[in-house]
Amino acid sequence: MVLSQRQRDELNRAIADYLRSNGYEEAYSVFKKEAELDMNEELDKKYAGLLEKKWTSVIRLQKKVMELESKLNEAKEEINIGGPIGQKRDPKEWIPRPPEKYALSGHRSPVTRVIFHPVFSVIVSASEDATIKVWDHETGDFERTLKGHTDSVQDISFDHTGKLLASCSADMTIKLWDFQGFECIRTMHGHDHNVSSVAIMPNGDHIVSASRDKTIKMWEVATGYCVKTFTGHREWVRMVRPNQDGTLIASSSNDQTVRVWVVATKECKAELREHEHVVECISWAPESAHPTILEATGSETKKSGKPGPFLLSGSRDKTIKMWDVSIGMCLMTLVGHDNWVRGVLVHPGGKYIVSCADDKTLRIWDYKNKRCTKTLSAHEHFVTSLDFHKTAPYVVTGSVDQTVKVWECR
């Protein structure tokens, strides 16, 4: 590329300034003479530090070009996958693909939990800004804000009909919302510290909650009374989740364990210990995944009768573990995240595990082969939560960057 006379003159003056300001006096004198430069104070000011600025801006541009080339290659790959071959892909194998369909903004603090409505095309998000927001995931429209908590909302859960929403907060309360009228119909008090997790039981009659007070409590939906307290964890209980038929609940804790409890007797059926740090998240594997799990793990447990149940856990030790609850054994460990794992789910098709973490990624794991098949750079900050729609091809994520993102699967 040939420079114009003016550009050449500017470059020469910038080089001369660089040589002089860095003490290369002899080189400066020779260069000034050979380039026939007439340097003066006014011109000197204009070109001071110009060469360094140009150099750093070139490096910055090169980095940006590399990033854009990487994104372009990723987009080309996605287009190829989404072409005629991709269209033949079994819906059970659909996974989230970049870029996101929507990035929803509105929360003023980190998003702590995101969930899909079981019936309507609605997403609900909870945040440290003490609000719950409702969005339409098909249009990306914001619908409304539910206010009532006075501190960070930590978790939210629908009943199977989608008519009731439960929420819990660092304000030490659990609230029950009529999701048709968007009104708080009950507030439950009883925990002595931050309530970190809540879930409505499958029968819809009870709610379970977990707290920093080291307990798990069960509440009656009709009255708001606490009917059971499960004790055993030695530290903050981070998450609680019931299994599909509501006979068991699983909990994870800062004490680095996962516990499984029999609801009827409050007995701790299993204490699962292999994580080396706080266990942030848990989820039960649906029955649709059991055949793949048995094939993947070569598990010979329960040859007679139903296999499992199987449980997933994600930890600050950066790993995901799969457990056979019936024998209290870890079946596999998935390693790949570069920071705390904050969310983990089995894909509705049963073939994949989907996880999110503080490394800002969403990862899809082919657990049969124990490898990560896809990594999405999902957010600008820690990814705190994810949910997979049970029937429609969508995944939703929430982040410390205060956004909620909807991802289309194909």
UniProtKB/Swiss-Prot annotation:
Regulatory subunit (beta subunit) of the cytosolic type I platelet-activating factor (PAF) acetylhydrolase (PAF-AH (I)), an enzyme that catalyzes the hydrolyze of the acetyl group at the sn-2 position of PAF and its analogs and participates in PAF inactivation. Regulates the PAF-AH (I) activity in a catalytic dimer composition-dependent manner. Positively regulates the activity of the minus-end directed microtubule motor protein dynein. May enhance dynein-mediated microtubule sliding by targeting dynein to the microtubule plus end. SUPFAM superfamilies: Lissencephaly-1 protein (Lis-1, PAF-AH alpha) N-terminal domain, WD40 repeat-like. GO terms for biological process: brain morphogenesis; cell division; establishment of mitotic spindle orientation; germ cell development; microtubule organizing center organization; microtubule sliding; nuclear migration; reelin-mediated signaling pathway. WD repeats lie at residues 106-145, 148-187, 190-229, 232-271, 274-333, 336-375, 378-410. This is Lissencephaly-1 homolog A. HAMAP family: lis1. It comes from the Eukaryota. Pfam families: LisH_PAC1, WD40. It is found in: Cytoplasm, Cytoskeleton; Cytoplasm, Cytoskeleton, Microtubule organizing center, Centrosome. It comes from Danio rerio (Zebrafish). Dimerization mediated by the LisH domain may be required to activate dynein. Signal peptide: none annotated. Can self-associate. Component of the cytosolic PAF-AH (I) heterotetrameric enzyme, which is composed of PAFAH1B1 (beta), PAFAH1B2 (alpha2) and PAFAH1B3 (alpha1) subunits. The catalytic activity of the enzyme resides in the alpha1 (PAFAH1B3) and alpha2 (PAFAH1B2) subunits, whereas the beta subunit (PAFAH1B1) has regulatory activity. Trimer formation is not essential for the catalytic activity. Interacts with dynein, dynactin, nde1 and ndel1. Residues 7-39 form the LisH domain. Keywords: Cell cycle, Cell division, Coiled coil, Cytoplasm, Cytoskeleton, Developmental protein, Differentiation, Microtubule, Mitosis, Neurogenesis, Repeat, Transport, WD repeat. SMART domains: LisH, WD40. The gene is pafah1b1a. One of its GO terms (cellular component) is nuclear envelope. GO terms for molecular function: dynein complex binding; microtubule plus-end binding; protein heterodimerization activity. Residues 56-83 form a coiled coil. Belongs to the WD repeat LIS1/nudF family.
